C-alpha cells in the first residue's frame, strides 16, 4: 500500500501533491503559493508535520486541477514538506478538509483517487427564517 501522489496544475505550473487524510489542513511550498498569486499574511501559529515544527505566517487560495478536476481551497504556506516514496519532493500536502469538501476519496490499496462523488454543483441548505 503506497501513499497517493499526483501531478497537479497550479497557475499553469506542475507540482507534486501528496494526499494525506491524517493532516487536517492543506500545506503548500512557497513556489506553489507564488503560482497562486494570492498570498496573504495570517497570525503566526505553529504546526508539527512529520515530527518537525514549523511556523505558519502566510496562506493562499489554492486553485488547482487534479486529474482533470478543478478544486479551490485555502492552504498554508510552509517551508518544507519532504519527499514521496520515490524520493521526489512534495510541493503540496492535500489535507482531509480539502478532500472532504471536494469529495475526493483516496484508495490507498490501489494508489488511486476516487472522484465518484466530485460535486458539479454545491447544494447549500439554509434554515427557514424565524
What do these predicted ranges mean?
Residues 1-130:
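Pepsin/retropepsin-fold aspartyl endopeptidases
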